[in-house]
């Protein structure tokens, strides 16, 4: 048996996955024969066989190119969609297999808890000496907050998400070993129905989504998935604590959610004060509607009659107060429910929620009032033999109210520093504002930021737009409460003047509380390598500024800093980005501690490794000691949201993993490693020389022309994927002006994945040449940061394909001979040292399940990529005007994304 096929060996626990993949693959074949033709299915089989043979012999893709070249756009699109449909069912099968494995762990009992879950985390903590008292003291400090962001390369439509959930549900039902043959046939029919409907649904919308569309998309995950699983998360934690320690303390809220959709103005002219207000209103309606529906369901359960059981005096008193508060609603109560106090109170609680929606008399002033009502019901049920008569359902609703409040998710607002600077310069009439250094600007801004002098108002678009934003935030704080608002993030923050500028603008916009303070958490986002290096100085200057320190005192002496993984990688390469982020956290923590401020980090991670993606548990294990301290705030983007939160069971697993990782990192951080003092200079050298190689490549003359020819970036820019443009508005096509997401997406499509590894080999070679090979091996063995870094690079390399990348590169004409040899040589150097330092014969040798997943997909991605190159060449020959070819190319982009499970 050849090497390729012999490597596709499923471990015993994964044999059910193999069976599912085979069964669903056959179902895809039936679908293609029915929806297109038997001849089309035969053609797909011929292409598939050729692709597998190429992989087995490690041959160049020329045989595939000959077979696929010159197809009519409609035929090409159908072929691509056929392979994409295979990826769709394989991805679903793998997700359902994760559910299967989770159930197997749960059935086996707590002697073998699932790795990285809550049971596993608590058992490890107890083994390290953490007592129940210590755990109880830490729990109120735990704050885990995934923040959902709009993603300009998200390639999954809402209509397809819903059908995917139907397919998942049918497979999950089929896991039940008690299903009858008829029931299994029904499951298969449901799957086939959803799959066929998906085939008949276009992969992409013909129009660019609006901010409202993006908000609805994120709202789907919040209201349809996470709303359902939040109570289960807390129940799982209680069970894990009881199993580990024997008793359970009262649990505080540990989880909440944030969003950027509707508030991220950076480079997006479609986001403004109106979308901020509209988003907050829409989220309020969505979550209050869920509460009303759940209370309605609860009412039918809480039908206890006072002729049979008692209720608490506190509940009776509350019922009387509500009758007086809402006489019209009380009058509508049905007489036959007169002996059912829980149901009567429930009716009036729903009436109060409706009044809250309508801003009418009798509205709840805050979520805490609804929590109080639910707690009254719980206490009364517990005191009157009702633990098994509705208490469980009422408690689940209470956990939801604690988690989602009346706002569903906290809304962040983000804008670039230069936008604020231009507005202030215009307001002050200072044409040389940019020429002044940060100290000079801070001195000018001080009186305005402190509220001593009003910042002048001027009648121009930039100032009016910002005034409207801060006025909207002030109104939102009054209407929705402080909990509805997250942070104000300054992208491309460079110095303290950038922060003081926002403080001054907020005051002018009316965002001031009764005490005269600005009730806003202002968060600088350090994105470039240089800004990460200078971030410590910026924060030190900021915390030493008396005006800002007074503002911070009103915010609890807690400062948040956001770390940008995307632009730092685009700027200096992945090695410099990762090391710069690591060093920045250490230095920022030390600076904040010296000045008596608690510093928390907001991690701006993306889906790909090049943008900070990867497992949260491993990332936190590799993070600097003390950098978590009970809190995790991290962006969740695009396909990451889909992958982690698209299915309820996997969403629950994701929340458990994050919470468990935060508990482990906070309660028992790694002991200080004295060898790090010796390792850091070596990593400095790796990062420095890696950056030199990376910048020499991307900074070479005509590189941007090469990039635009050797990747499908021009197709991506034409796709209707998000409301935000791929380049910063009004700027040219230079690399610095291209956003990180399409940069990574384009290289991922071309299968070169440059942002995820380029320069690493040169950096490692430089360290070896300097005599540090044994130190590097020691670092790979014993330093979680470095080991995780190498593992991530190995994963990226495994998803790339040099042969396919060469096909794309040849589209650049003469530039191919200049740039592709650099890619080939750096790839060989990087791959060689990564394998050597990880002591592996092949990439991902330590993770056979991931390796199998990638190898399973590659032969099916290859035909799409080869076809993409052919179509791209033909489309460009029409100056990008052939819409049929463009549609086929868009199908290719979606297909490759499904296959590699990665966009930007």
Curated annotation (Swiss-Prot):
Q: Which residues form the active site?
A: 151, 570
Descriptive protein name:
Phosphoenolpyruvate carboxylase
Q: Which UniProt keywords apply?
A: Carbon dioxide fixation, Lyase, Magnesium
Q: Which reaction does it catalyse?
A: oxaloacetate + phosphate = phosphoenolpyruvate + hydrogencarbonate
**Role:** Forms oxaloacetate, a four-carbon dicarboxylic acid source for the tricarboxylic acid cycle.
An example of a Gene Ontology cellular component annotation for this protein is:
cytosol
Q: What PROSITE patterns does the record point to?
A: PEPCASE_1, PEPCASE_2
Q: What is its EC number?
A: 4.1.1.31
- GO-annotated molecular function: magnesium ion binding; phosphoenolpyruvate carboxylase activity
**Xref: SUPFAM superfamilies:** Phosphoenolpyruvate/pyruvate domain
**Required cofactor names:** Mg(2+)
Give the GO biological process terms.
carbon fixation; oxaloacetate metabolic process; tricarboxylic acid cycle
Question: What is stated as this protein's family in its record?
Answer: Belongs to the PEPCase type 1 family.
């Amino acid at each position: 048996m050849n090497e390729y096929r012999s490597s596709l060996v499923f471990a015993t626990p994964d044999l059910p996955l193999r069976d599912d993949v085979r069964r669903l693959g056959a179902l895809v074949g039936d679908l293609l024969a029915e929806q297109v033709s038997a001849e089309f299915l035969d053609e797909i089989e011929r292409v598939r066989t050729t692709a597998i043979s190429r992989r087995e012999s490690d041959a160049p893709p020329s045989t595939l190119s000959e077979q696929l070249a010159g197809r009519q756009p409609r035929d090409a699109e159908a072929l691509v969609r056929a392979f994409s449909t295979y990826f769709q069912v394989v991805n679903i099968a793998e997700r359902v297999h994760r559910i299967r494995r989770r159930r197997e762990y749960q059935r086996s009992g707590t002697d073998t808890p699932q790795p990285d879950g809550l049971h596993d985390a608590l058992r490890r903590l107890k083994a390290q000496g953490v007592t129940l008292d210590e755990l109880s003291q830490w729990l109120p400090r735990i704050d885990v907050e995934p923040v959902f962001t709009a993603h300009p390369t998200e390639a999954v439509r809402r209509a397809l998400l819903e059908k995917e959930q139907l397919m998942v549900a049918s497979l999950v039902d089929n896991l039940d070993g008690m299903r009858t043959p008829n029931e299994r046939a029904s499951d298969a029919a449901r799957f086939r129905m959803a799959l066929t409907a998906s085939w008949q649904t276009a992969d992409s919308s013909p129009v660019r989504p609006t901010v409202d569309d993006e908000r609805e998309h994120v709202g789907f995950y919040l209201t349809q998935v996470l709303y359902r699983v939040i109570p289960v998360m807390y129940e799982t934690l209680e069970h894990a604590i009881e199993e580990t320690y024997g008793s359970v303390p009262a649990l505080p809220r540990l989880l909440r959610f944030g969003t950027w959709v509707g508030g991220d103005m950076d480079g997006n002219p479609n986001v403004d004060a109106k979308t901020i207000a509209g988003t907050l209103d829409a989220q309020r309606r969505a979550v209050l509607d869920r509460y009303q529906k759940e209370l309605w369901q609860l009412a039918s359960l809480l039908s206890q009659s006072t002729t049979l059981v008692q209720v608490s005096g506190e509940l009776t008193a509350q019922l009387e107060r509500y009758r007086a508060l809402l006489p019209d609603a009380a009058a509508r109560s049905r007489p036959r429910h007169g002996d059912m106090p829980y149901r009567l109170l429930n009716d009036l609680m729903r009436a109060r929620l409706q009044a809250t929606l309508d801003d009418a008399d009798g509205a709840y002033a805050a979520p805490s009032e609804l929590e109080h009502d639910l707690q009254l019901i719980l206490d009364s049920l517990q005191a009157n033999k009702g633990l098994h008569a509705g208490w469980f359902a009422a408690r689940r609703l209470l956990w939801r109210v604690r988690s989602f409040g009346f706002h569903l998710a906290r809304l962040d607002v983000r804008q670039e520093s230069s936008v604020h600077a231009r507005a202030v310069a215009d307001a002050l009439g200072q044409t040389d504002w940019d020429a002044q250094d940060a100290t000079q600007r801070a001195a000018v801004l001080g009186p305005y930021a402190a509220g001593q002098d009003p910042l002048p108002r001027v009648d121009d678009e930039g100032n009016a737009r910002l005034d409207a934003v801060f006025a909207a935030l002030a109104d939102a704080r009054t209407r929705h409460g402080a909990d509805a608002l997250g942070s104000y993030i300054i992208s491309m923050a460079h110095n303290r003047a950038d922060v003081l500028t926002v403080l001054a603008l907020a005051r002018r916009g009316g965002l001031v509380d009764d005490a005269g303070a600005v009730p806003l958490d202002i968060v600088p986002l350090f994105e470039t390598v240089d800004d990460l290096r200078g971030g410590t100085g910026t924060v030190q200057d900021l915390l030493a500024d008396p005006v800002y320190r007074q503002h911070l005192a009103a915010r609890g002496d807690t400062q948040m800093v956001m770390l940008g993984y995307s632009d730092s990688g685009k700027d200096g390469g992945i090695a410099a980005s990762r090391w710069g982020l690591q060093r920045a956290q250490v230095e920022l923590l030390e600076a904040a501690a010296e000045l008596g401020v608690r510093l928390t980090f907001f991690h701006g991670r993306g889906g790909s490794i090049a943008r900070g993606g990867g497992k949260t548990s491993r990332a936190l294990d590799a993070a600097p000691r003390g950098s978590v301290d009970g809190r995790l705030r991290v962006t969740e983007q695009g396909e990451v949201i889909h992958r982690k939160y698209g299915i309820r069971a996997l969403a629950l697993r994701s929340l458990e993993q994050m919470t468990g990782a935060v508990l482990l990192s906070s309660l028992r951080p790694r002991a200080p490693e004295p060898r790090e003092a010796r390792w850091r200079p070596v990593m400095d050298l790796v990062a420095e020389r890696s950056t030199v190689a990376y910048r020499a490549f991307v900074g070479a003359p005509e590189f941007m022309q090469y990039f635009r020819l050797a990747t499908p970036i021009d197709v991506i820019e034409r796709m209707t994927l998000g409301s935000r443009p791929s380049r910063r508005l009004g700027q040219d096509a230079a690399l610095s002006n291209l956003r990180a997401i399409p940069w990574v997406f384009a290289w991922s499509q071309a299968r070169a994945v440059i942002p995820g590894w380029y320069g690493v080999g040169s950096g490692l070679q430089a360290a070896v040449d300097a005599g540090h090979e044994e130190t590097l091996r020691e670092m790979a063995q014993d330093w979680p940061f470095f080991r995780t870094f190498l593992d991530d690079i190995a994963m990226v390399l495994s998803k790339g394909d040099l042969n396919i990348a060469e096909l794309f590169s040849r589209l650049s004409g003469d530039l191919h001979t200049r740039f592709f040899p650099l890619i080939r040589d750096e790839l060989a150097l990087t791959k060689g040292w990564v394998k050597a330092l990880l002591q592996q014969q092949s990439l991902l040798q330590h993770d056979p399940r991931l390796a199998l997943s990638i190898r399973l997909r590659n032969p099916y991605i290859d035909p799409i990529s080869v076809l993409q190159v052919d179509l791209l060449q033909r489309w460009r020959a029409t100056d990008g005007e052939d819409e049929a070819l463009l549609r086929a190319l868009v199908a290719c982009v979606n297909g490759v994304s499904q296959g590699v499970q990665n966009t930007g």
